[in-house]
Amino acid sequence: MKPIVSILLFCALAVVIVGRRRSTGRGIPYVDEKLPNGQRCKPPGFDCSKSEECCGPQDTKNYAHGCAPQWSGMWNKRVNECYICYIESSSC
């Protein structure tokens, strides 16, 4: 009985850790610029296909940005979203 309970707890913990949505950096100031194709860059949390479409942070020394897969509960699958994160954090 104990091994079964241990396995169930491990599985539940793994689902919580792996399934956690990463912060996209919505509150971090970013540079809203015009891209070479004439469109505006996409802010954190918006859908993207490549990193060049995403707005960069104002503080480029401490923050990084890009386009990465995020879990979407609305679509029930992974979608690419722009993000900005603190370089020294473990989630970046």
UniProtKB/Swiss-Prot annotation:
Cellular compartment(s): Secreted
* Disulfide pattern: 41-55, 41-82, 54-67, 85-92
Name the family: Belongs to the neurotoxin 27 (Jztx-72) family. ICK-41 subfamily.
The record's GO molecular-function terms, alphabetically, read: ion channel regulator activity; toxin activity
> What's written under domain?
The presence of a 'disulfide through disulfide knot' structurally defines this protein as a knottin.
> Which keywords does this Swiss-Prot/TrEMBL entry list?
Disulfide bond, Ion channel impairing toxin, Knottin, Neurotoxin, Secreted, Signal, Toxin
Q: In which tissues is it expressed?
A: Expressed by the venom gland.
Q: Tell me, what does this protein do in biology? A: Probable neurotoxin with ion channel impairing activity.
* Signal peptide annotation: 1-19
CC per GO annotation: extracellular region
Which organism does this record belong to?
Answer: Trittame loki
Domain of life of the native organism: Eukaryota
Protein name, as recorded: Toxin ICK-14
Claim: Lipid metabolism is one of the keywords in the record = no
Q: What is its main location?
A: secreted
